[in-house]
Design a protein with these regions (language model features):
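Phosphate-group recognition and catalysis centered on beta-loop-alpha active-site segments
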Residues: 1-277
Length: 277
């Protein structure tokens, strides 16, 4: 069993790390060592794509206002924490280019065309996965850009997914052209993961911030873990690799027979090299 992808939710945005969905949070995640950055995209009143989770500035900045009713210049005046500004999408593409892929959540169906266009203009299509809670949005993206990988987001299911329910989910994912299911971690079962795997669908779990949940889900076989604490996830996965419960990725297998501290030193060197590329 190989370890799951380490996906930084809104960057390294956990308490004590960095303000969510900011360039600082994404840079922090990359310096810690992750496989992918998760971001949220919205559009301003003047048609500019920005990286922000909420429909308003109220929770994450020192300003108030509905994003859709504001122009970019107004939004950029807001402090998103520690002096950071709300980034535009192109800035995040530029930061992540050749460093890590982006898991891009479209927050509103009507901006699908804008997002696809922005990805094309930035020549970023080989480094992005598009996702949405709305199946129609995913389907729309796949019609516009069949080459883009896509993920369907699922929240809490009404019941624990039976094998029949799992097969229905498989059909839904395949019908809209997605190749990944991003699902709330508490809903996951081994049978659901197995049904998805049989049909070639990857399963990514969100948002996983507790060590015990990280460990259990990695052992369950999920292919991706979305977390606000990539530093904690790295430690959990390292422990699982040291104990032989998961197989290190090819780039880390040479570390398998070394001591704990030697491995950590080597992992830091690998992360520093990746950061410099």
């Amino acid at each position: 069993m190989i370890p799951p992808l380490r996906i930084a939710h809104r960057g390294a945005s956990g308490r004590g790390l960095a303000p969510e969905n900011t360039l600082a949070a994404f840079e922090k995640a990359l310096s810690i060592g992750v496989d992918m950055l998760e971001i949220d995209v919205r559009v301003t009143g003047d048609g500019q794509l920005i990286v922000l989770h909420d429909p308003s500035l109220d929770r994450t900045t020192d300003r108030e206002g509905i994003v859709r009713e504001m122009v970019l210049e107004e939004i950029r005046q807001a402090d998103a924490g520690d002096g950071e500004r709300v980034p535009i999408l192109r800035e995040v593409f530029d930061l992540a280019r050749h460093r890590a892929p982006i898991l891009l959540e479209i927050k509103s169906d009507f901006i699908a065309e804008l997002v696809v266009q922005a990805i094309a203009e930035a020549e970023f299509s080989e480094q992005v996965v598009v996702q949405s809670f709305n199946p129609q949005t995913v389907e729309r993206v796949k019609r516009l850009a069949p080459h883009l990988p896509a993920s369907l987001l699922i929240g809490e299911l009404p019941t624990t997914p039976s094998r029949f329910r799992a097969r229905r989910l498989v059909s839904q994912v395949l019908e809209i052209g997605a190749n990944t299911l991003s699902i709330w971690h508490a809903t996951l079962t081994p049978s659901l993961i197995e049904e998805m795997r049989k049909r070639g669908i990857a399963v990514w779990a969100w948002t996983v911030d507790e060590e015990i949940a990280m460990r259990d889900l990695a052992m369950m076989g999920v292919q991706g873990l979305v977390t606000n604490y990539p530093d904690v996830l790295n430690n959990v996965l390292e422990d699982l690799m040291e104990s032989g419960q998961v197989q290190p990725p090819l780039g880390r297998r040479r570390l398998q027979n070394r001591g704990r501290w030697a491995r950590r030193r080597q992992l830091r060197k690998m992360q520093a090299t990746r950061k410099g590329n």
